[in-house]
């Protein structure tokens, strides 16, 4: 079967107990193209925003992976598991649980630039082997702490009864942040253990649940309805400044050549990421870079 010539961004509201790769397979089948990727995996137990990249949009993956993401999570106190979430085996338990005030007192120390030790049950690799493959063999290795940024961490609910004590948190964080590790570390800081009981991604970059469609709804649609859901590739970069080029300079940019700012009348700071437009619309991402003859904008990814 020949791939359809179709491109765009699809926001799926991923349900529980399916993998991100399952969603890639579904989109390949429904959109009739093998060119499908995503902009950041969700574990099977997690739900919410999964940014699917169809056709030429798959080229945007590396850039979208860097975007800030927002999650809603439930932290259950009193137990620790080998996976740091509720799907794992309990490896420690505690008869004590924190009060709401005690939890609120430690949260500020988990905001901003922090370090996390990645969990063994993760897709990170050591000597070509994924850590979760080693973990399933009962092997644990030392992992270096990695810097991540927690931009926002807010307590939205706290409840305690005879069965459990749980807290609902909203977290906005950088690439590479493990929410289950955050839950685990908060529990350890409070001296009572903690594990992630639920996780829902509500925002990834510019995309929210308002843009999302469920897999079941997607299956019910006809081809035209599904195609109409696809967002333009440029929507992923709506927060970047746009530079519109006349045909002469657009031809240079299409060839990957730098264009000096003094020649097109722009004064963007070095390091600025930009969107390139020609008479047909968005066609590339670029960056402002220094050159001997002055500052220039350089195409770095053509779409």
Set out the residue ranges of the language-model regions:
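RNA pseudouridine synthases
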Residues: 1-211, 285-286
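Accessory RNA 3′-end/elbow-binding domains used by RNA modification enzymes
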Residues: 1-15, 21-38, 42, 46, ...
